[in-house]
Regions:
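Extracytoplasmic gate region of multi-pass secondary transporters
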Residues: 31-32, 208-250, 255-260
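Helix-breaking motifs and short loop linkers at transmembrane-helix boundaries and internal kinks
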Residues: 43, 75, 96-101, 130, ...
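Conserved MFS/SLC helix-loop-helix module at the cytosolic interface between two early adjacent transmembrane helices
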Residues: 62-101
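Structural signature of the two symmetry-related core transmembrane helices
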Residues: 78-92, 274-289
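Cytoplasmic helix-loop-helix junction between adjacent transmembrane helices
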Residues: 106-142
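Intracellular juxtamembrane helix-capping segments at the cytosolic ends
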Residues: 116-129, 311-325
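Helix-loop-helix hairpin linking two adjacent transmembrane segments in secondary transporters
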Residues: 130-188
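A late C-terminal transmembrane helix in Major Facilitator Superfamily
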Residues: 327-363, 369
Length: 396
């Protein structure tokens, strides 16, 4: 009977994690299919419009770096609840007529909520699901990306069935409110307070490997951030409809969800390099397809690129967690990696917007990210488990 109750609690907690994960990306991906209309209504340039994606992502990075402080001063229950409330308020702000300051404020507010949750969840998963960390991390990542797909696919459909097109963006407050109630109901049984540790302090900021992981994570997620910001606009520009362009982004995130579930499940050995290399090859194929054959096989390029991006995200988290058996040290490393990484990733859509303004098309953007993937392949070779810093492995 006790075992059955434990299984029920575990299953319920997994459902709540999925609900929360589904709210991590619609604030970003729902904008892409409406970007031409938003730019026209607000008068934003390409580089300013890119901030709608860049601001939340950079904010995620800053809050990931503050992860240790959050763990020490705010309970997990409260921090996640407040974060979901911020996401809901950020979405509701978009019910008003689109103006640059309002849209950017909503992006920043939602980014704070997303950033806090992403700083908290890896350590929650590592502690709560120690024996199944790769699978649960994959499920969490798949929920993130699945939510992104819903944002891209459903928003154009909502526009078609709404009297005021921009107010459809406010509908994404609803799933955040649902997740808030689910978390508040479930969390007292699972994570009622923050878990302070008395372990020896380890300053990962002074280790070259931590910075390598941060840059690695950032360049991978930079490709994702640029795609959710500009892929629909790219296809609208070359003749596709907003609905079709949003569907392509949704298919890309569907591929991401599949990659996030499948690749961690295949990660049976501590050496993650083969799977990371596979994920990077898939990304390279996708970006090259966008450059040379964008209209011939757009669904294939979107899904292949998504599969690679989706697989790489949880594999990066696992790679960082592998560096220490101590949850406290591993959590610090993941927080630092995500902090530096999301700041770099947040700059990618802005830089892509600048390249678009300079070149007059998006081909230079995709070429830039293809070159980044080649560089990431070279860095991947350095991630042999025998080269992990031994201090992190042994020290508590």
């Amino acid at each position: 009977l006790t075992a059955m109750r434990n299984h029920q609690k575990t299953f319920t907690m997994l459902l709540v994690l999925v609900l929360i994960g589904l709210n991590m990306r619609p604030l970003l991906t729902s904008v892409g299919p409406l970007l031409p209309q938003l730019r026209q209504a607000s008068g934003m340039s390409f580089s300013v419009a890119a901030l709608l994606t860049a601001l939340p992502v950079v904010t995620m990075g800053g809050l990931a770096l503050a992860g240790s402080w959050l763990h020490q001063h705010v309970s997990e229950r409260r921090s996640v609840a407040i974060s979901l409330l911020l996401i809901a308020v950020g979405a509701l702000m978009r019910e008003l007529y689109p103006q640059s300051a309002l849209l950017l404020s909503s992006a920043l507010l939602g980014g704070v909520g997303i950033g806090i949750i992403q700083a908290v969840m890896p350590s929650v998963i590592k502690r709560r699901f120690q024996q199944r960390t790769p699978l649960v991390m994959g499920l969490w990542s798949a929920a993130l990306m699945g939510g992104g797909g819903l944002g891209a696919a459903i928003t154009p459909w909502l526009v078609q069935h709404s009297e005021t097109w921009y107010q459809t963006l406010a509908w994404w407050a609803l799933p955040a409110v649902v997740a808030l109630f689910a978390w508040w109901w479930q969390s007292p049984r699972e994570v009622a307070s923050s878990h302070k540790t008395t372990t020896t302090p380890v300053r990962v900021v002074f280790t070259p490997r931590a910075w390598t992981l941060g840059v690695y994570f950032g360049l991978i997620n930079g490709g994702y951030a640029s795609l959710i910001a500009w892929l629909p606009a790219f296809y609208i520009e070359i003749g596709a409809s907003a609905q079709y362009s949003g569907s392509l982004l949704a298919l890309m995130t569907l591929g991401q969800a599949a990659g996030a579930l499948l690749m961690p499940a295949m990660a049976r050995h501590q050496d993650r390099r083969k799977l990371l290399m596979l994920a990077l090859v898939l990304q390279l194929v996708g970006f090259c397809g966008f450059i040379w054959l964008p209209m011939q096989l757009p669904v294939l390029w979107a899904m292949v690129c998504g599969l690679g991006l989706g697989g790489a995200f949880p594999l990066c988290l696992l790679l960082a967690l592998d560096h220490s058996v101590q949850p406290a040290i591993a959590g610090k490393l993941v927080a630092f990696m995500q902090g530096i990484g999301f700041i770099i990733a947040g700059l990618a859509p802005w830089f892509s917007g600048v390249l678009r303004s300079i070149s007059g098309n998006y081909l230079m953007d995709w070429a830039f990210h293809a070159l980044c993937v080649v560089g990431l392949m070279i860095i991947t070779l350095r991630f042999a488990p025998v080269r992990f810093p031994q201090l992190w492995v042994k020290e508590a």
